[in-house]
Amino acid sequence: MVFMANKKKTKGKKTRRPTKAEIERQRAIQRMITALVLTIILFFGIIRLGIFGITVYNVIRFMVGSLAYLFIAATLIYLYFFKWLRKKDSLVAGFLIASLGLLIEWHAYLFSMPILKDKEILRSTARLIVSDLMQFKITVFAGGGMLGALIYKPIAFLFSNIGAYMIGVLFIILGLFLMSSLEVYDIVEFIRAFKNKVAEKHEQNKKERFAKREMKKAIAEQERIERQKAEEEAYLASVNVDPETGEILEDQAEDNLDDALPPEVSETSTPVFEPEILAYETSPQNDPLPVEPTIYLEDYDSPIPNMRENDEEMVYDLDDDVDDSDIENVDFTPKTTLVYKLPTIDLFAPDKPKNQSKEKDLVRKNIRVLEETFRSFGIDVKVERAEIGPSVTKYEIKPAVGVRVNRISNLSDDLALALAAKDVRIETPIPGKSLIGIEVPNSEIATVSFRELWEQSDANPENLLEVPLGKAVNGNARSFNLARMPHLLVAGSTGSGKSVAVNGIISSILMKARPDQVKFMMIDPKMVELSVYNDIPHLLIPVVTNPRKASKALQKVVDEMENRYELFSKIGVRNIAGYNTKVEEFNASSEQKQIPLPLIVVIVDELADLMMVASKEVEDAIIRLGQKARAAGIHMILATQRPSVDVISGLIKANVPSRIAFAVSSGTDSRTILDENGAEKLLGRGDMLFKPIDENHPVRLQGSFISDDDVERIVGFIKDQAEADYDDAFDPGEVSETDNGSGGGGGVPESDPLFEEAKGLVLETQKASASMIQRRLSVGFNRATRLMEELEAAGVIGPAEGTKPRKVLMTPTPSE
């Protein structure tokens, strides 16, 4: 029994080990199931179906970025062609190397985008993709994902972003070379064969062109011979001899010759018509202005090209006993001559090349569409001309006799539908032509740089306030002279290009004018647009950002205008040009050098904000300046993004006749600015309608673009030459928070710190004149005038009596 029990225990049942074929079959089934499951998951990721599909796609994007589709396709191919790919080592290696090159290229492109502020590569890449992953969205470009970031980071550190581009291209070329399994010799032979084929094709085309040219010459020569033969035969057939004199009758022969001419040379034959298409890049351009700096002396008007910077300073030694002349209230303060260089155009970034060649094909297509659309409405028109501008293309059409103009203008929406355009503006008619203009937006807007516009502008450099504004549809630069406007209203919605246009106008004036020729008063309630110009020598006072101070600052300008008119009256001139001419004549005949009055440009960047704080005072100041400031050399530029009637009132419009309208939201706003519709159809980004004082219809222009870097460069150039010299007479002073501007704007401070000194000087000399106060106290003309007014208000001196000197009403006391 024991033996049997032991035997039973040792004789256990053995398990059969699976065969090799069974193991391989099980692995094949596992691979098939895995491939099927992964295929389903990747399919949801490809079509991004639901939250699951988007999550799958974002997980793959986290790894390989925008190469997610390539990764999915490669994974599926590997799953189903595993055995075949094991035998293709060079193909797999080439694909992996090319994929690494693509990852580097995509990531280099990602970090060349200006919107990517954070340059920490791994952190920035993770933040971009994780934000989409958490929100179940696919919104941003992911570059090469985290794998691309890991590869790109050391390459960019060692070789920069451009070097990463080059290395990525090398990886792609190497990968394709390995995938193709070609030898170097095969590639060289292919390149040589391709080069020979191109050379043969070029030689064949050259021979064909030569043969065609010779054939045309032969045909033209044959036609000339036949035409000459026909003329001779007609002449011989028409010869008529006078029986009495035996002379040939020439007149009759010429008449018969005209009748015998073949129809192809008849003068009345009608040529085949084809509309003329003028491209923006081929439009006429003026020669660029020279960029060599011109050096000026502050006390002279004429340029001195060869001034040495180490010249001796010129200081005028004036005699206190100089008699007052007709030019009495002028600045005789000795001044140190400043060498000042005007900025040059090379401070601005060069413009990028523009290519609108593809617009020509679109224009030819639109010409046919326009004619067919008008024909479908029963209107017979012919497109005479098409001009491709920077932002729009203008089609000039000529309607048939009897077609009413309003029938064409009423079809703007139908034309926009037929042309698939954003909007269509119809100009009926074009000023000076018997044609109608149809303006259609281009597929791409060509940016007009400030440097390009300046170089092509024909503005007179002697006119300090003549500045280039933009380019018309025909590509010609358009300038305007602010002195003739004489004030300018700039209005449009947010982001339409107002501030860029104002910066362009300011920069243009700074390019031409010295600090003693033009002065600015800038009012910027937004505090960010004009603050860059602080501390330039052209400013009268720092940029005003407080709306309550702005109304007082405008009142100071009004006071300056009145003072200038009083000065003109004493001198006997009508405007600032006449006064400065008198100054030049005085300087030529006298050792005392007098400074001419500068032009003043008042710039308000946001009028609506001022009208909300002190509408009555601001409106009164603007109206007074608009009515009288032109002759005094004071000009205004008013900008607003809210062109409503409560901001641009009727009185302001009546006194600011020149307007610029940028894109607005409605025809009502357009009528508020221009008194007509049109601005609601503009495209934005500098597209404007310019209506100067001397034109009845607005002109469409593409304004120039000037970047913040360009503005900072020109401002830095000016600041390096001279410091700001602010005029206290224009300082609006301090305002309290409760001051609502009801006082009509700031007046003269109660007492000048030099009042007592000026009073003692007048009582001591028993003479009172602004020129004497200027000489003795070393102050400017404006401050001396204020001191004279305070002395008059205090009863020290009498009122002005024309050209007679003022009477001193007080006598000095022993204590004085």
From Swiss-Prot:
This is DNA translocase FtsK. Homohexamer. Forms a ring that surrounds DNA. It comes from Streptococcus agalactiae serotype V (strain ATCC BAA-611 / 2603 V/R). Consists of an N-terminal domain, which is sufficient for the localization to the septal ring and is required for cell division, followed by a linker domain, and a C-terminal domain, which forms the translocation motor involved in chromosome segregation. The C-terminal domain can be further subdivided into alpha, beta and gamma subdomains. The alpha and beta subdomains form the DNA pump, and the gamma subdomain is a regulatory subdomain. PROSITE patterns: FTSK (PS50901). Essential cell division protein that coordinates cell division and chromosome segregation. The N-terminus is involved in assembly of the cell-division machinery. The C-terminus functions as a DNA motor that moves dsDNA in an ATP-dependent manner towards the difSL recombination site, which is located within the replication terminus region. Required for activation of the XerS recombinase, allowing activation of chromosome unlinking by recombination. It is a multi-pass membrane protein. Residues 1-18 have a biased composition (Basic residues). Residues 726-737 have a biased composition (Acidic residues). The keyword Transferase does not apply. Belongs to the FtsK/SpoIIIE/SftA family.
